[in-house]
Amino acid sequence: KSPLTGETLESLTARLAERGEPAFRAKQILEWLYKKRVTSWDGMTNLSKPLRAWLDETFDFLPATLVVNQQSEDVTDKLLLELRDGSLIETVIIRAPQEGVGVDHSRKTICISTQVGCAMGCVFCASGLAGLKRNLTAGEIVAQLIHVCRREDARTPRARQELASFDNIVVMGMGEPLANYDALLRALTILNADWGLGFGARRITLSTSGLVP
C-alpha cells in the first residue's frame, strides 16, 4: 500500500475520483491528517464507514513506526523509526530553551532524514558507515514530521490551533538530500502546502555535501 503521507491534494483527489468521490473529500482527509492529526482512519468521523474501509485497504496511514525515543541531558530527542521493510532511520528534535518559558515551550528544530544510509562517505558522519541502502519515499520523509507532531502535541497541543508542533526544519539527517531530489521536493511541497502542514519555506534549511542534481 502507498503511504497517505506521500499524497498531494491533486494526486489524492484523482485517486478518490476513480472511486466516484467528490473533489472536496481529498481536502477533508488531508485536514484530518495534518491539521487535526488523528491517529487512525476511524478518527476521520465525517467520512463514511465504506470510504474509511477503502482508505484502509488502499493506503498505509503512516509508513513508519516509532521504535524508541532517546532523550539527552540537553533535552534533545532522537526518534528511531522503523520503516515497513525493516529499515531504520533517525529524526532529531533539537530544543532551544528560552528564558522564562520552559522546555516545553522552547523553540524546536527538527532534523529529518532523506535516505537509509548514505553513499557520500563523509569522514565526520556516521550515516555512511554501512553505505547507502535506499532512498526514502516522499511519504516516509513526511511521516517523520507526523511522529514529531504526535510527540510534541502531547507537550504543547498546537494541533488545537492547527499549527505544526515545531519551529524549523533542517534537512541534514541521514542521507544526501539532493541525491533523492524528486522525493524530497514532493515531501517539501506537502509540508509547505496549505492543505498539508502549511509550514513556511523560509523556515526550512537544506544541507548538502555539494551534490548538484
Predicted regions and their residues:
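Conserved Radical SAM active-site core
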Residues: I94-P213
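Flexible, acidic/Gly-rich N-terminal and inter-domain linker regions that tether
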Residues: K1-K108
